[in-house]
Amino acid sequence: PVNMMGASKRIMEMFLMRESLTQTISMARFANVAFSDGSLLHGFNQRFAKQQPLSAPNDIRRYFLTPRESGELCLLSGLLGGNRDILFPKLSEKLHLITFSEIAQKFLNYHGYEVFECNSEDEARGKAKKLISTKKWPCYFFSTDTTGEKDIEEFYTNDEILDMTRFDAIGIICNQPNFDEIKLDEFLDGIDSLRSNKSWNKGDIISLYFELLPEFAHIETGKYLDQRM
């Protein structure tokens, strides 16, 4: 994982793997849920309603599922998944990967507007009122320099065991219960210590993540997508 969200999901899987020794556990990994609360696409809806410019990276590609599809995947995992099975959608890189800037264009076209691409956030803000009145929408698309972004979405690693034949549209990761019990306990102790002290910062949490996940590839830039425009 390259960001805190991905790392937290990986840590959750490790704890569930430990629980799988005493009860049946199945899981799901899936792409971004389109227009879910707090997402960049949810921000498109909010900005459109307020007649504000759209801002999005043009070099990040993502897979997207509808809320219904993501719910169905979780339900199928619960009903059909075996112990320690992790279900994920079979998606084609050529057919399903799309950039946020492409989604912004499709979103605006759907609402009857053309994209007017600006060279800066200030330009987009300054031209918003005049452009929108002519059915054009100011957008600022940029190359990524924000924390925790990855070029493409990945559902599994080269070290994981896959079953790609059981279902037509769903793949399955069939991992063994691989976890370090001592490190999991140390992680919990670290979290408990922070809570007891009633004071912590992001760096404290990141340090605990690195101790449990040596492969964690987080790079802090101090910039975040939700701060854009």
Locations of the language-model features?
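Strand-loop microenvironment adjacent to phosphate/nucleotide-handling motifs in alpha/beta enzyme folds
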Residues: 14-229
